[in-house]
Amino acid sequence: MKIDGRPYRTIFPEAGGNAVTVIDQTRLPFAFELKRLASLDDAAVAIRTMVVRGAPLIGVTAAYGLALAMREDASEAGIERAAATLAATRPTAINLRWALDRMAAVLRRAPEAERAALAFTEAASIAEEDVASCRAIGEHGARILAEIAVKKGGPVNVLTHCNAGWLATVDWGTALAPIYVAHDAGVPVHVFVDETRPRNQGAALTAFELNAHGVPHTVIADNAGGHLMQHGQVDVCIVGSDRTTAAGDVCNKIGTYLKALAASDNRIPFYAALPFSTIDWTLADGVRDIPIEERDAREVTHLTGRTDDGAFATVAVVSPGSPVANPAFDVTPARLVTGLITERGVCAATEEGLAGLYPERRKAA
């Protein structure tokens, strides 16, 4: 996507494979800064501290992190150590494990002397595949928005939660890709952007993206979505996913489940947009089996923003001494999901629906 007319991806390698550059998302929306990752530790810290975030981008960053590690130690033990370090950074997003498993499998088949170069080639392939998948998700999802616009005879009001745009992937995004494709095709679209506490990824990141692309949008408080649905102001909900089970349960940013409940109660379609790499084919019951990351209490107790004089400040917003819980994700049961928008098309959030799009998985099972 473009920032001030210049095309950017969220991650890109330096010539020669000595490092990769990422957009530092902890500085957005008030400062657009690039950060250089030159080692395994740099990549792991970037993932853990959410300099990069979003399931697909986490996976690609991990792939490049493993490639950086191969410059120092390309042995079997080196592969194992690097993969373990990266896997420990964020437990919920399945793309992380998927990318590491793919990288390790490719590297183990190659002679040790060839692994460093091969690792960067494979990481770049994963990045390119992510871009293609997200673009395809956008095409499939845009058809849904176009149909709603024709039926309604006016702008489509989309509600989204957290950030599942190009900042969460290499480019285009998942949940926002249909919005970008539809907008670029002339379909009138307006987006309600949940602020998405505690890290405000909707207000900070999704609004930043939509502003940059010229998409009409309104930032709302997290608890406003149900009210808007009750009063007919939302036509469709589209969210991303950090892990989707083989049965169609969708794990996404905390608060997604509540939006799905409100959408169901008001008969509003609720879609999750995700690439193949987000599907965990080993799990059937997402509520029971998906590990939910518990993050630092300071994300809840403190807020960081820009003051009127342009300085950045962090302030406390919770009564001192109050205990805090900070689960980062929740799981929306498949029964509340109208459909899954993938790079291969749209399907029901069921085992049969996913198997119809990915028949090779059924054969593998």
UniProtKB/Swiss-Prot annotation:
Belongs to the eIF-2B alpha/beta/delta subunits family. MtnA subfamily. It comes from the Bacteria. The lineage of its organism: Bacteria, Pseudomonadati, Pseudomonadota, Alphaproteobacteria, Hyphomicrobiales. This is Methylthioribose-1-phosphate isomerase. It catalyses: 5-(methylsulfanyl)-alpha-D-ribose 1-phosphate = 5-(methylsulfanyl)-D-ribulose 1-phosphate. The keyword Isomerase applies. Substrate binds at residues 53-55, 90, 201, 252-253. Pfam families: IF-2B. One of its GO terms (molecular function) is S-methyl-5-thioribose-1-phosphate isomerase activity. Pathway: Amino-acid biosynthesis; L-methionine biosynthesis via salvage pathway; L-methionine from S-methyl-5-thio-alpha-D-ribose 1-phosphate: step 1/6. Its EC number is 5.3.1.23. Disulfide bonds: none annotated. The record marks 162 as: Transition state stabilizer. Catalyzes the interconversion of methylthioribose-1-phosphate (MTR-1-P) into methylthioribulose-1-phosphate (MTRu-1-P). The active site is at 242 (proton donor).
